[in-house]
Amino acid sequence: MITDIASYLRFFDSVRRRTERDVAALPPGAAAWRAPAVDGKPGWSIGQIVGHIGGSRLYFASAYRDEGWIWSEPESDPAEQATWLPWLQASAARFAEQLRDTPEAWLARRIEMIDTPGQALSGWRLLMMMLEHEVHHRSQIDAYAGLEGWPVPDIFGRSAESIDALQTDQRLKHARRA
């Protein structure tokens, strides 16, 4: 459970930095990339996903502030990669500003869901939904990048292989069998 906004915003800052890092790592060809159509419906481009991440931050902030589940149009051009990072940065700053001075009691108050009248969730859960949503779409971008053979940054600056290489020492240090 999230118990104070300052702690939440510090965690959000770490999540948004990783999103920006991964988007910044995309090659110039990423702007032209398109997901394959499914059932005749075109998939979103990476630029559309980036725009959606930024807009969704403000959507969740609006709901948390009891201003309605209001969607903000992305202030980026899906076809212009140069607009992606500025939009992510601007939406992150606006999100943090909209939450920074909200009362701590709002973390526990109930917020009615947009599509299920009578169903509500606590403020802290809504804020965690925003983070899960962002990580979901960042992972989507990273999966597409990997499938295209583009570089995908390690999530915490560590690869699975680098951790595997340390396992023998860890097992010895902690006296566990392999």
Q: Residue spans of the language-model regions?
A:
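Active-site rim elements
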Residues: 2-9, 80-85, 127-131
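Acidic catalytic patch
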Residues: 101-117
